[in-house]
């Protein structure tokens, strides 16, 4: 790890989004040897003579006269050539005269100084000029390469090149490659200056590159589609490596709608995000389908609230119809959570009139039943034994702050006071309340709002008698063009996952096909999702440049550092942004050649993604398959889009994940997303990859370190049972392929394992049994789990997956995600991911009516976790979404 990298424990980390961008100095155009010029003149034109401050004015005049004679000579050589450089020489001469005047002024100022001051000034000037000469020589060579390429293009293409863009504008010296059209090149340039919105803000005469807004390039390619937009060769090579010069001339990136210049990247509305408009009959059918699935949950919630009203009627000695419920303070600008279980409050709840302690109806029910848990805080103390220990060597003395064992706070003796009539006293002080006043029933929504909603839903369903659309599909047990084998279970028929092409998802029968698999809780893989988009670059450096050049971003000036996660220590590291992205494409290693795996999670923050990268956001949404479900803005079957105005919507993305990766499974410090379970549905698109190849020296070092890791694991487990057998098994595993499916590792980029919902109990049992075989923070063994899945402290390696199948007879769906593929993950399905290459993924969450029951089940599961558990907060508010 670099010495400049800071390591911090990752508990509830927040990424730093403070941006900076190095301003690149404009390069100065240099004369070059064109066709027909002599080598001597070319050599003379490159020489730069340092001006001396002590030169007399007469010598300066002679030097300028000599320079003018050389200009005439150069113009003779270039008279019939495409590249007219006389104007450049004039401008460059003017610059040198200005610089000469500045030097004279400086000399006048320091005449009164001593010799040391003058000597120091001459030393600085000489050093700067020496560096500048080297830069000029390098730039000359680069420009000559471009000229050679232009000559080849001119010789092999039918396009014509203009000798002069305007007879009245001697400053236009840039070559423009344009198609043979009836329009003159001058009119093309005029249009590019007057009509191009992206460059109109830049007031510069003559042709300029649309990308870099510079007019000093030797060769510009003009688009034959719009006949006005131009790109220089350097920008094409740097920012559009997938486009050739011919492609740009045929149709420029701006016309292709994938221009990644600073201006275009911050424009929104250029990409049509919705793939098709729904007919009225389709909308009616979708709404009926949605309400049919949601109405049972609405009825259940309504019954639950009516029971609480009956308890309140008993407390007040009235009939339920006579109970008046006071409206709580408006909560439209904030989320309301239960102060005991942290679950979101939808409508009815109890509140203390003195301390405003709020309690949800579920906690009220548990208090009356005597089953309420205090949910004490959990305390994790992972031991930091140093970097040597993480790499399988001897451990250092653990720091005093990390030598405690995992422990759980002792439950307090405080108890809730429950009246005989069902009334509840405020929570004791130890639990956050005042313990004095009775909790009163409060409401958030209008009094009859829920009953009216229930009545409207039932009326709607009875008024439209639409026959259900069904598609009897058996592809889960058959290998076809629309399926991908992902498991080898002998007792079930769901080993094949539905895997359609993105071009076919717009068909109605494909949506029905998707719904049938989705209702069963099966993942779905959509191939080539990015093929339907304009092709905007998802290269991380392009995204970083867009963030840094965002003038509206308050943090764009502090982007030089990012906080990534070190996968080996599971801790935050602060690293230079450019170094991180260089490691993304080239790889990074520790001093012992063990691969260093870093990842950026939710970068930039999802709540700012649409503002900071509007074009990327629109492109991602336009690429989403089955937009009836996945569209975070207008998906008709996405329940998360149904919240009325004024309510705070849950943060469902889009979210970007950028992480390193290599094909080999390291077993320790892999670039992984550990086993977890999302409380909502999600779709994940792989937008960019970069392959990193390990050297032979690295491979040898990794193999030796793996042996040390095995020995360390045996010591940590303090067990030598069956050591010989296990050692043989592990030795075989090192030589076995990681991917057991028929996927080609060269095309695959991310290895997914998704478990079925019905296998979760056995999976949890296995994890509890083998939890100490996993490593988490500081690469320390996991000593205790509160919830084996929601703790997110385990990743099942190939060895663990084999043991899981041998002991419990279950296995996940295992497949490799390729570039451009979209993976749909149903709510309630535990899953994990390991990167086989450096990957950039973009994901968005949604809530489908088929899986709302799983969202509510997970909400109940999360509320049973300890108070400070990171998964405990009800971020989705599934109960509110069900309304």
Swiss-Prot record:
Binds 1 Fe(2+) ion per subunit. The keyword Transcription applies. Expressed in inflorescences, roots, siliques, leaves and stems. Fe cation binds at residues 676, 678, 831. Zn(2+) 2 binds at residues 223, 226, 252, 255. A motif (Nuclear localization signal) lies at residues 755-762. A zinc finger (B box-type) spans 333-392. Its EC number is 1.14.11.-. Residues 34-43 have a biased composition (Low complexity). Belongs to the JARID1 histone demethylase family. This is Lysine-specific demethylase JMJ29. It comes from Arabidopsis thaliana. The lineage of its organism: Eukaryota, Viridiplantae, Streptophyta, Embryophyta, Tracheophyta. The gene is JMJ29.
